[in-house]
Amino acid sequence: MEDFVRQCFNPMIVELAEKAMKEYGEDLKIETNKFAAICTHLEVCFMYSDFHFINEQGESIMVELDDPNALLKHRFEIIEGRDRTMAWTVVNSICNTTGAEKPKFLPDLYDYKENRFIEIGVTRREVHIYYLEKANKIKSENTHIHIFSFTGEEMATKADYTLDEESRARIKTRLFTIRQEMANRGLWDSFRQSERGEETIEERFEITGTMRRLADQSLPPNFSCLENFRAYVDGFEPNGYIEGKLSQMSKEVNAKIEPFLKTTPRPIRLPDGPPCFQRSKFLLMDALKLSIEDPSHEGEGIPLYDAIKCMRTFFGWKEPYIVKPHEKGINPNYLLSWKQVLAELQDIENEEKIPRTKNMKKTSQLKWALGENMAPEKVDFDNCRDISDLKQYDSDEPELRSLSSWIQNEFNKACELTDSIWIELDEIGEDVAPIEHIASMRRNYFTAEVSHCRATEYIMKGVYINTALLNASCAAMDDFQLIPMISKCRTKEGRRKTNLYGFIIKGRSHLRNDTDVVNFVSMEFSLTDPRLEPHKWEKYCVLEIGDMLLRSAIGQMSRPMFLYVRTNGTSKIKMKWGMEMRPCLLQSLQQIESMVEAESSVKEKDMTKEFFENKSETWPIGESPKGVEEGSIGKVCRTLLAKSVFNSLYASPQLEGFSAESRKLLLVVQALRDNLEPGTFDLGGLYEAIEECLINDPWVLLNASWFNSFLTHALR
């Protein structure tokens, strides 16, 4: 890699990168990928600045190098590449002369035309993830962020790309060339996988001077300096220490060990109450897609263009009306919102050129649905100190809900096969070393089993929706942007297919903190009549919007088409995790791999081929009231994947708590089955900790029900 860097980059850039690594005490002979990354970043910063000047009229112009007009002012001040002291001197000088706010971190450039600092990012990962990391680190609206990737993607604050398209294309071409050159030399995979998340200043922070003396004075007894204390903490093994402390505890602490027998455990108590309701961010088994095969229309790949093309495939639209109202909402507003979407889509079609994005008119119905101006006013605490009865407002305890059959049906459906292919082979990642040939074979077998699975569709749908929503939240903070809910797949014959599930309308999204909420209205197509399970759709207002002709064995039949509308909300951190659902594939693959490994160690040879190709053998899938359910290896793969996907879709504090606490009971039961004669104390407290997590979440309630089935059959 070092040889490649020295051949590929300008010697001046290489020299600057060497200095930077030396400044931070890093060895470029060892950290070769970092060396390449620093050179790439420097080159992008220089290319960003190249040829851009400001003329005497204050206008930004482009001038090639051989132009004799040398009196022009450079548009960009380059800060990256200078040593830290000089860089901060330049930043301070700019702030003093322009009145710009001083940034907390060293930026890369200053734009004299737009009067703002610029942070340039070059990533080997997805631009959205890297943008989010940069934004979270900088936490400043005054520094403009512009991210480039090696695949030609880019992302910038408020979708303001600063430079003209030609200048940006030059940068993207150079990055693509670097990637190709690395790939030709077999360096790309290592380089791509070596990228870490954005580092914070603390990782590089050296304590010196007064702060260092204070740190040394503040140490516990017996420690002479901070390094010794750090070394002790890093190497601290708590177990023996805790056991010693337990023996010194008061005799009043009752920790009497009780034997754990087959008759000891009782079933977990599930809550009573009305049935639980659907709380996923998008419809699962009830979703309906409007699809186009082999899309080749103008603007193919632009979500709004794809959505309009999909909408044109359906001819059964009719005057919408409410069939299942939301009990607490102003239902006519949901109806008006759908009519507004239809009207504004029609307006777009009447235009000469379809825009890339659509911002909805801020009508009264959308303002209501998106909670505009509904948030309570925030008041500074200092202004309230004198109020004698100041207290936190009372919040109601969540209403207990009982388990309902629909969530088991949802899970069963997620394990089923569809007639489409949702992932290509490379979704799970490439081999890194030759020894991974067996792993490749396992991965290919696994992919073949799950590529058609409905749970895989949910992954791709979730990734798309969360990415689009986060993008819009960053780029159009004040707008009510219309976001089509789209997925891409292939038919069994290999033809490409674009699917539209419905639309999202995003509310105002000034998301400063990870947990700040953006409201959105989702409108999703379905053929499911909500009156069959009204409790499942408690949070929805459902409209009937058309009639769909369906072909069946007995001919054509007409079914009413519904639109499920609800107000919902999410946050940056939830969208980030939603965008990262693909590792669900990896998690379930690893679980299958451990089964193959166990089988191989018994037979003392690799059993991958036999494991996947022996269709007659069945494997345990899970527990049900009937006992241990078994199925083919493909069914096991799909069940494990569906569990992983549902953990992501229904992620909640209730699930975290239940998983952590029930695992303790599971380990004790497992020890009993292995004849290890386990003992417990305060088993009642453990049950209490488990049961306080069973409130109203459908996925947690289903897991608790499965756990009870396991207890019944495990202790027979």
Swiss-Prot record:
One record GO biological process: symbiont-mediated suppression of host mRNA transcription via inhibition of RNA polymerase II activity
Location of the motif Nuclear localization signal 1 (NLS1): 124-139
Residues that, per the record, bind Mn(2+) 2: E80, D108
Motif (Nuclear localization signal 2 (NLS2)): 184-247
Record-linked Pfam families: Flu_PA
UniProt keyword DNA repair present: no
General function of this protein: Plays an essential role in viral RNA transcription and replication by forming the heterotrimeric polymerase complex together with PB1 and PB2 subunits. The complex transcribes viral mRNAs by using a unique mechanism called cap-snatching. It consists in the hijacking and cleavage of host capped pre-mRNAs. These short capped RNAs are then used as primers for viral mRNAs. The PB2 subunit is responsible for the binding of the 5' cap of cellular pre-mRNAs which are subsequently cleaved after 10-13 nucleotides by the PA subunit that carries the endonuclease activity.
UniProt key word Disulfide bond: no
Annotated family: Belongs to the influenza viruses PA family.
Binding residues for Mn(2+) 1: H41, D108, E119, I120
HAMAP family assigned to the protein according to its UniProt record, in alphabetical order: INFV_PA
The EC number(s) this enzyme carries: 3.1.-.-
Modified how: Phosphorylated on serines and threonines by host kinases, including human casein kinase II.
Protein name, UniProt field: Polymerase acidic protein
Species name: Influenza A virus (strain A/Korea/426/1968 H2N2)
Cofactor dependency: Mn(2+)
Cofactor note: Binds 2 manganese ions per subunit.
Domain of life: Viruses
Keywords of this entry: Cap snatching, Endonuclease, Eukaryotic host gene expression shutoff by virus, Eukaryotic host transcription shutoff by virus, Host cytoplasm, Host gene expression shutoff by virus, Host nucleus, Host-virus interaction, Hydrolase, Inhibition of host RNA polymerase II by virus, Manganese, Metal-binding, Nuclease, Phosphoprotein
